């Protein structure tokens, strides 16, 4: 046993005399306040996380529903364009004089044309991973991209046109 005036007792008593009890109690009170704030913040973050998870699930379901709707619409449009091509081919066979100015290749329309950019196709396929594969067949052809359609974008709206030519063209129309 150490005598009462041992070096360790003297050292510890001097250290204890340097610490103010009011400062220690103030530090403990500040730590308790911070702990309460952190617990409240943690609880709020947990609630926010739960709410965010629920909203994410709802939005994911809506996104999948809309994606399925878009894929169905694409299939419907593919079917419509196939029917249009079929009707166009029948009309070309029945009335060849009406289609004589259109090149033969535009009547048949190549099946390897894909007006949908690859990034869109990839997006559709990626979003449908959980619901099955999607139809990314390249037989959707936009009239503006088809060589058989005349580009009328250069004509001013409101100007009368006959056979694709306006009255303001340099050449005079027959019968004028």
Curated annotation (Swiss-Prot):
GO terms for cellular component: BORC complex; lysosomal membrane. InterPro entries: KXD1-like (IPR039843), KxDL_dom (IPR019371). Pfam families: KxDL. The keyword Acetylation applies. Residues 95-176 are annotated as: Disordered. One of its GO terms (biological process) is vesicle-mediated transport. It comes from the Eukaryota. Residues 119-131 have a biased composition (Low complexity). It is found in: Lysosome membrane. Component of the BLOC-one-related complex (BORC) which is composed of BLOC1S1, BLOC1S2, BORCS5, BORCS6, BORCS7, BORCS8, KXD1 and SNAPIN. Associates with the BLOC-1 complex. Interacts with BLOC1S1. Interacts with DTNBP1/BLOC1S7 (via coiled-coil domain). Belongs to the KXD1 family. This is KxDL motif-containing protein 1.
